[in-house]
């Protein structure tokens, strides 16, 4: 496997995200995410867009990197942001946001093990709300396609 900068990963090595909040990040890297944010705002125009989904077809395509950095740039611009980790198989966002492992999250809310408010984490220093993936379920695809998922997203939109 290769990382974002073309270096081959060692077996068992965790990938590292390049967060725009890191003062060592090159100016061009940070500006690319700000440009993406601006372009999304421009494309939305007068539409009332409140939800973005970042996904990919295969692992290791940097969807987590894009999701977290786009969330950070949106929050930095004053928008209310809820970053939801729906990778129920191999969640990683909690690691980069220092949210702890096996905390309550999406899977726990959808299986009625906790409320949405109990699972949400306010990351005040980043100006965003984070909903971790939660406990890995045996049926991630089915869990995300149930009606409760849409209800959860609708509730988050109103917060």
What kind of region is each of these model predictions?
Residues 1-159:
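P-loop NTP-binding module
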